[in-house]
Structure formats: C-alpha cells, structure tokens
C-alpha cells in the first residue's frame, strides 16, 4: 500500500511517516503490527478520542435521515440549529450568532471578509509568528514568512506587529478594519497572551472602531481548562473563530459574533459569504 500511496496520493513532505493505519480507538492508532499512543490527535482535532461511540452513533442516525442538503443559512436543519444554540449558551451575550463553515481556514476567511464588509476599511493587523491557515487570506495574515514567500503577492494592507507588545498597539488607528490574534499562539510554540496586553488591545480596538478577532482554532473547545481560552482573560472579541476540536475528528469551522454584525452578509450582495 505504501507504494500506491507514494504513486497516487500527494504528500506534503519528502519523507512522509508512511504509517498504514488500519484502526484507531480512543488515544491510540494501530498499524498491522503496532499500537501507537497518538499525540498528533489529527492535529488538535480528536479531543474526545478516535471512534467515539457517541459521535459514531450520531452520524449513523443522521445519515438515515439525510446527509447534505444546504450548507448556508437557508434551510432549517435541526442539528446545525441546535449546535449554534449550544455555542451561544456557552459564550458571552454579544457572541450569539454562528456561521458554520467546512474548516477553520474558511472561518478565518469569513471573519476577515466580515470585518472589511462591516467597517468599510481594508487594513488588517495581525501578529508576527502567528498561524491562521493556508488559504490565501489566512496565509496572508499568518506571521511566518517562510510559509508565505513562495506564494506572494498575497493580500495587500496586512501589517504584522509584535505579539504581547503594548507599544506596537499604537499602529492601530481608524483606518484599520480588524486585528486578528490567537489568545495563545499555536504555531509559535504555545505562547500565551499577557492579560494586560489583551485588555489594552481590546481598549484600543474600542477606541478606533476596529473589529477584534480571536482565532481559537487551536486553543478552543476545552483545551485550556475553560471552553475558550479568552475566558481566562476576561476579554471578549467581536468575532470568535473556532474549528478543529469542534468536530471531534470531522471537518467543521465557525465564526461567532453578534447578530447585527453577522447581518452584513445578508445583502449587498446577498449570500455575502459562501463557504
């Protein structure tokens, strides 16, 4: 199978691990002859283990009713409505409306578009050493030049500042559409925000009418001891981006904000964001 893998399926490194997985259960993955404790976890995805019976049973039950009918907010689908309701119940009152996507990087794209759409501004502030995804917009706001240099030109008007630098917040003015930040930087080695930093960032965004986006794709869904990392800081974003562990092993992402802000996607044009 490894020969067919190398012949027919694209790889992302010159020397892939090449483990032929035949089964996964709980915290373990299995090849024909070995059992491995899985510290990869689908890259921060399998938060409740492989082959979780509750997830599997839910999938089987849903497939007996229907699978795909419409991804946008047009048809009423009980599972997605109940998910959005649950997320609202877990979050502060201002984060009460959810747009579901197929992945985390799609959710980042949606958040950036919504910020530009709602403010009428183009400039975006992000952090050095940040990671937000690999599609065009999310790569543009990511802070690792080694990942970006082969794909330039990327989005214009993106400026990167030093993470946790209060002094650098002075670049935020009324020409900025949004600031996007990971409360805990994942790709940089799990670097935590300083509490005072996030509070001053929130205050600066309030002062300048700038949308504050928290990317909790890696830090969200219980990975820090609270459901969302921003809860440790008592600072609430305008837009929250989640994904990865939200699906427990299946592709999903979401942006969550207040309904007034989300309504910007309804008109001029209609279907203002299509995932």
What are the residue ranges of the model-derived segments?
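Conserved N-terminal phosphate-binding loop of PLP-dependent enzymes in the Aspartate aminotransferase
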Residues: 1-275
């Amino acid at each position: 199978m490894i020969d067919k893998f190398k012949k027919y399926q694209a790889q992302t490194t010159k020397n892939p691990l090449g483990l032929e997985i035949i089964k996964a259960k709980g915290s373990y993955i299995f090849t024909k002859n070995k059992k491995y404790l899985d510290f990869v976890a689908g890259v921060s995805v399998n938060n409740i283990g492989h082959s979780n019976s509750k997830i599997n049973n839910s999938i089987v039950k849903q497939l007996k009713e229907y699978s795909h009918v419409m991804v946008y907010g047009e048809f009423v689908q009980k599972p997605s409505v109940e998910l959005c309701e649950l997320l609202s119940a877990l979050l502060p009152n201002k984060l009460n409306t959810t747009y579901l996507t197929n992945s985390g990087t799609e959710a980042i794209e949606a958040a950036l578009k919504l910020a530009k759409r709602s403010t009428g501004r183009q400039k975006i502030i992000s952090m050095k050493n940040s990671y937000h995804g690999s599609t065009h917009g999310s790569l543009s706001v990511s802070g690792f030049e080694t990942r970006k240099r082969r794909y330039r030109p990327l989005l214009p008007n993106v400026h990167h500042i030093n993470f946790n630098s209060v002094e650098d917040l002075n670049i935020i003015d009324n020409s900025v559409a949004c600031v996007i930040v990971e409360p805990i930087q994942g790709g940089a080695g799990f670097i935590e925000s300083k509490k005072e930093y996030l509070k001053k960032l929130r205050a600066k965004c309030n002062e300048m009418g700038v949308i504050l986006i928290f990317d909790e794709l890696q830090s969200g869904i219980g990975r820090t001891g609270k459901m969302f990392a921003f809860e440790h800081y008592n600072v609430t974003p305008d837009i929250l981006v989640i994904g990865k562990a939200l699906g427990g092993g299946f592709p999903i992402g979401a942006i969550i904000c207040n309904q007034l802000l989300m309504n910007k996607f309804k008109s001029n044009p209609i279907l203002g964001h299509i995932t």
